[in-house]
C-alpha cells in the first residue's frame, strides 16, 4: 500500500513537473532536422535488434528526440521504456541496487562501473522537463518507476570528489529529480554536494582538467542546472562554476584550429584531441558548424549560447603569448603550464593524471593549416605509439597476453599508456621534463618506449646538424650523438633534445614514418592534414624507462639564418646532469637562465625546480601573473 501511494505521488507530481516555475521551457530548434531524423532511424533500428545494439543510456538520449520529433507512436515509446526497465536492478540486496546495467546481457546485480545510472538520469530527466505531457499514462508510470529506483542507485554509488564529471552530474541529477518530483530534501542533497564540490575546486582546482571529452560533460551538467533550476542560490553557484570553467577553456582554446590546447587530464585521442567539448559546444558557440543531431546537446548548447563569452574570456582567447599556470588537485605538485603564442602553444603537467592523459604537448596552427596532428609525448609498453589499441580491437586480439591476476578495471581493451613519475619546469616556450616509469599490467613487451608524436607538416627537419627528408614509408632516421631534433613550420621552430636516459648505448632514438593517418571515429569531422610521424626511443628489456628532455619552441623565425641561430642555441646550450643513488639533478643554461629539475626517481620525490621565472605563489588559475580563479571561487571555501 505504501509503495502504491508513492507511485501515485510520482505520477501526479510528475505530470506537473516544473509547473511551479510558472513557465514552459522553450525547446531549441535542431540545426539539421534531416540529419536528426536519420540518426533516429538508425537508433530505432538498433534498439529493435535482439539483443538491442543501442546502449541503455543512449535509449534515454534517443527518447528525448523521439518525443520532440514525434517519431514514434505512444505504444512504441512505452515498449522502449519497459525494455529499459528490465535493466534496472530492483533487488535491494544487490550490490548495485537501483542502478542500471550498461547493456542487455549482464546479470548478477553488480554493474561494476556504477556511472550508468548517472548518465541515464542526466539524459532522461529531460523527458520529464520538456515532454512529460507527451507521455501516455503507462509510459509515464514506467519512467517514474525507473527514476524511483535511479534515486536509490545514485545514492548507493560512491563517487570521489575528484571524479569531476560524474560528481557534477550527480549534482544535476539530484537537483533535477528533487525539483521534478517536488522533493525539497532531494534538492538540498544536490545543494550540499554542490557546496562540497565548489569548496574543493576553490582550493585545488578542477582535477579532470582540460579534457576534450569530460570538460564537455562538466559543461553539460552545469548548463542544465543553470537552465532548469528554479532555486536562485543554486543558479548563482552554477553561473560561478561556469564562469570558472569557461575562463579555463578560453585561456587554452585555439579558435582558428577549433581545438582545446594545453595539457589534458583525460584525452581519448592521442594524436588529435578534438572531442565532445569542441564539436558539440565550443566550435558551434564560436561560429563553426553545428553538427548536433541530439536535442540533449542542443539544449545545452542553446544555454551556452545564451550566456556567451564574457569580454574577459574573449580577450583571453585572443591574447598572444599568454602563460597559464593552473592547479588541478589537492596533492602536492599537481599543476600544469601552457604558453600560447600565435601559431604554436606548448604545455606541460608536473604530474601524471591518468593512463590516457596528455601531459606534454605542442600544438601548431596557422591560417594555411589551422588543424593538424598534435605533438605529444607518451611512455608505453604495447607498441601502441599512436593510441589506436582500442579502435583496432587489439584488446580482443591480444587477450591471450592478459597477465594472471589482471585487475577487473584494468582497461585491457582501452588505449592505455603508463602513469609514470614525472617532474617538469616550464618557462614560457620551453620546459625541461624528467619521466621515470616501470612496466605495468597493460604492457605486452618487456621493454618500454618513449615516443613523441609529430605532424607530417614540417617545412624542414634536422637531426643534429644534418638536414634530412622525411623517411620513406616504413623507414627511419636515427639520431646522432647530439640527441637533438629540430624542425620548422612556417616561422615556428621546435626542438627536442634528450638530456639523459637509461637506454642501452647501442639504442638511439629515431624518426619513424609508419604511414600513419588519423581518421576520426568518436566525432564526425574531417582532418585534412592527418599524417603523423614519431620519434621513439626504446628502453632496456628490464621494463624500466627513464628519460629527461628539453622541449623548446620559438616564433618569428623568418629566415634560414634565424633557424640556424635557433638550432645552435639548442646544440650549444650547457647541460649539466648529475646522477647518484637514484637522484638526478639536471640543468640547462638557457638565454633566460637556468632551467631544470632535481628528482629522486626511486622514491618518486620532486626535490627542486630551476626556473628563471618562478611560478606565482598560491595560485589556482593564473594567466600572465594575474589570478583569475580565486576571485570567482574564494567565497565558496569553507
Where are these regions (language model features)?
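Extended repeat-based interaction scaffolds and adjacent low-complexity, acidic/S/T/P-biased segments
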Residues: 387-638
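Carbohydrate-active enzyme catalytic cores, enriched for enzymes
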Residues: 232-348
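Charged, amphipathic alpha-helical segments
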Residues: 39-46, 342-349, 414-417
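Aromatic-lined, polymer-binding surfaces characteristic
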Residues: 51-229
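Bacterial Sec-dependent N-terminal signal peptides
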Residues: 1-22
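Mature N-terminal, pre-catalytic/accessory segment of carbohydrate-active enzymes
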Residues: 19-51, 628, 634-638
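Non-catalytic interaction/regulatory modules that flank or connect domains
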Residues: 313-403
Amino acid at each position: 500500500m505504501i509503495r502504491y501511494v508513492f507511485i501515485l505521488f510520482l505520477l501526479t507530481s510528475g505530470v506537473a513537473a516544473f509547473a511551479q516555475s510558472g513557465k514552459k521551457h522553450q525547446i531549441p530548434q535542431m540545426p539539421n532536422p534531416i540529419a536528426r531524423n536519420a540518426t533516429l532511424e538508425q537508433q530505432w533500428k538498433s534498439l529493435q535488434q535482439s539483443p538491442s545494439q543501442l546502449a541503455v543510456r543512449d535509449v534515454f538520449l534517443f527518447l528525448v528526440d523521439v518525443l520532440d520529433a514525434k517519431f514514434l507512436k505512444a505504444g512504441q515509446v512505452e515498449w522502449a521504456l519497459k525494455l529499459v526497465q528490465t535493466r534496472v536492478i530492483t533487488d535491494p540486496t544487490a550490490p548495485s541496487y537501483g542502478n542500471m546495467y550498461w547493456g542487455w546481457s549482464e546479470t548478477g546485480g553488480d554493474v561494476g562501473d556504477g556511472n550508468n545510472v548517472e548518465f541515464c538520469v542526466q539524459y532522461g530527466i529531460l523527458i520529464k522537463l520538456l515532454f512529460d505531457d507527451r507521455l501516455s499514462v503507462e509510459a509515464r508510470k514506467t519512467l517514474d518507476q525507473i527514476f524511483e529506483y535511479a534515486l536509490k542507485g545514485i545514492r548507493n554509488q560512491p563517487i570521489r570528489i575528484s571524479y569531476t564529471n560524474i560528481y557534477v552530474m550527480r549534482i544535476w541529477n539530484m537537483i533535477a529529480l528533487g525539483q521534478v518530483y517536488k522533493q525539497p530534501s532531494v534538492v538540498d542533497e544536490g545543494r550540499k554536494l554542490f557546496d562540497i564540490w565548489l569548496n574543493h575546486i576553490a582550493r585545488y582546482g578542477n582535477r579532470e582538467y582540460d579534457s576534450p571529452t569530460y570538460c564537455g560533460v562538466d559543461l553539460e551538467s552545469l548548463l542544465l542546472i543553470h537552465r532548469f533550476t528554479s532555486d536562485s542560490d543554486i543558479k548563482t553557484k552554477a553561473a560561478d562554476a561556469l564562469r570558472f570553467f569557461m575562463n579555463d577553456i578560453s585561456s587554452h582554446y585555439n579558435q582558428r584550429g577549433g581545438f582545446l590546447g594545453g595539457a589534458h587530464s583525460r584525452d581519448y585521442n592521442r594524436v588529435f584531441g578534438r572531442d565532445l567539448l569542441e564539436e558539440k559546444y565550443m566550435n558551434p558557440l564560436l561560429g563553426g558548424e553545428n553538427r548536433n543531431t541530439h536535442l540533449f546537446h542542443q539544449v545545452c548548447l542553446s544555454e551556452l549560447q545564451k550566456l556567451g563569452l564574457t569580454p574577459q574570456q574573449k580577450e583571453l582567447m585572443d591574447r598572444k603569448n599568454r602563460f597559464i599556470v593552473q592547479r588541478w588537485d589537492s596533492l602536492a605538485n599537481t599543476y600544469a603550464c601552457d604558453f600560447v603564442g600565435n601559431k604554436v602553444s606548448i604545455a606541460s603537467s608536473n604530474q601524471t593524471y591518468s593512463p590516457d592523459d596528455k601531459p606534454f604537448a605542442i600544438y601548431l596552427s596557422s591560417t594555411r593549416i589551422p588543424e593538424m596532428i598534435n605533438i605529444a609525448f607518451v611512455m608505453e609498453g604495447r607498441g601502441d605509439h599512436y593510441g589506436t589499441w582500442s579502435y583496432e580491437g587489439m584488446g580482443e586480439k591480444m587477450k591471450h597476453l592478459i597477465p594472471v591476476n589482471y585487475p577487473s578495471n584494468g582497461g585491457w581493451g582501452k588505449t592505455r599508456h603508463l602513469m609514470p613519475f614525472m617532474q617538469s619546469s616550464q618557462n614560457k616556450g620551453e620546459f625541461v621534463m624528467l619521466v621515470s616509469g616501470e612496466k605495468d599490467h597493460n604492457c605486452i613487451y618487456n621493454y618500454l618506449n618513449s615516443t613523441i608524436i609529430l605532424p607530417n607538416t614540417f617545412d624542414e627537419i634536422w637531426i643534429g646538424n644534418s638536414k634530412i627528408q622525411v623517411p620513406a614509408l616504413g623507414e627511419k632516421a636515427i639520431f646522432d650523438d647530439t640527441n637533438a631534433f629540430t624542425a620548422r613550420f612556417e616561422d615556428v621552430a621546435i626542438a627536442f633534445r634528450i638530456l639523459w636516459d637509461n637506454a642501452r648505448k647501442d639504442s638511439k632514438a629515431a624518426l619513424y614514418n609508419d604511414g600513419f593517418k588519423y581518421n576520426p571515429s568518436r566525432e564526425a569531422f574531417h582532418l585534412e592534414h592527418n599524417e603523423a610521424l614519431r620519434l621513439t626511443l626504446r628502453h632496456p628489456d628490464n621494463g624500466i624507462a627513464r628519460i629527461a628532455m628539453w622541449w623548446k619552441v620559438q616564433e618569428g623565425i623568418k629566415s634560414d639564418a634565424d633557424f640556424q641561430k635557433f638550432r645552435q642555441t639548442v646544440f650549444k646550450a650547457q647541460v649539466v646532469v648529475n646522477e647518484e643513488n637514484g637522484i638526478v639533478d639536471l640543468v640547462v643554461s638557457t638565454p633566460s637562465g637556468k632551467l631544470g629539475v632535481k628528482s629522486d626517481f626511486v622514491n618518486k620525490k620532486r626535490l627542486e625546480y630551476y626556473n628563471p621565472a618562478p611560478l606565482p605563489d598560491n595560485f589556482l588559475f593564473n594567466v600572465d601573473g594575474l589570478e583569475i580563479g580565486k576571485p570567482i571561487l574564494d567565497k565558496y571555501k569553507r
